[in-house]
Amino acid sequence: MSLVEAKSIPVLPIPNRKVCARSIFGIDVDMEVPAFAERTQFVPDIDQAYVFDKVTTIAILAGFKHNRSVMIQGYHGTGKSTHIEQVAARLNWPTIRINLDGHISRLDLIGKDAIVIRDGKQVTEFCEGILPWAIQNPTALVFDEYDAGRPDLMFVIQRVMEAEGKLTLLDQKRVISRHSGFRLFSTTNTVGLGDSTGLYHGTQQINQGQMDRWHIVTTLNYLKHTTEIKIILSKEPYYDTEEGRESISNMVRVADLTRSGFITGDISTVMSPRTVLVWAQNARIFDDIGLAFQLSFLNRCDETERVIVAEYFQRCFNIDLKESASNLIMGR
């Protein structure tokens, strides 16, 4: 979304109804959450097959209901951002998602002078960035990869993190207050203390004064084996046969082994649920589950670790890949 587009967006309506968390999200909790009666262009699409994690869902709902800033930490591919979007989708809550990559600048967030056409003439005019617009509307602002944000951006964001936080536009001599329906979320791979695993190059240590402003910090781990199978089958109903379910179960077993191997330090690359889904899709494309595994995951792994990963595959499917130890010994 450009600065000029943000300036031209109309003011959004406010939450005008309440929904029951138990009936909407299927979790065992008594909570009524504010929501919108109608959808707008900013509301994420609903994924009917999405499976909600109870603790993470409660944390996000508390953020929406009680105006709490919520941070979700977890490994890649666990569905942190998607979880926020799917909660917001069922509340019809407008959601803006910003990835804090190295190219996002302070001017992108706050705004800058831009040339616009007024009465047929070019004039220089200040155009608000996405942050001033978002905090003046009932939106859920999601900062993806929050721990990869540049330090100068962190202090801009810090201004609006408190429940009654205000944003000062120095160039405009304006002070903007938070809309009562504005909500703030973030997703991170670390908890602000830097990356000790070596998996997440580019992440930063986060100022602890800022970490203290996140009211709720929750962790979203990888899914249970049976839950992950259920999700893959819902996304790829082609496999919903006896043979297909066995194949998906074995795929998830391989993923579980990579996660266990990562935890014990045997390998440095983890198979996420997203990768399992891609593997299942590629297996249909190539009609070869072993080739699909190589192209979807194995080729990403360090060469010194491919033997271990190939053994995970062999253990689950009883198929030897060329990288497996037995083939290397035989010189195949």
Predicted regions and their residues:
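AAA+ P-loop NTPase catalytic core and its hallmark functional loops
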Residues: 2-245
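Alpha-helical lid/collar subdomain of P-loop NTPases
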Residues: 1-40, 50, 57, 224-225, ...
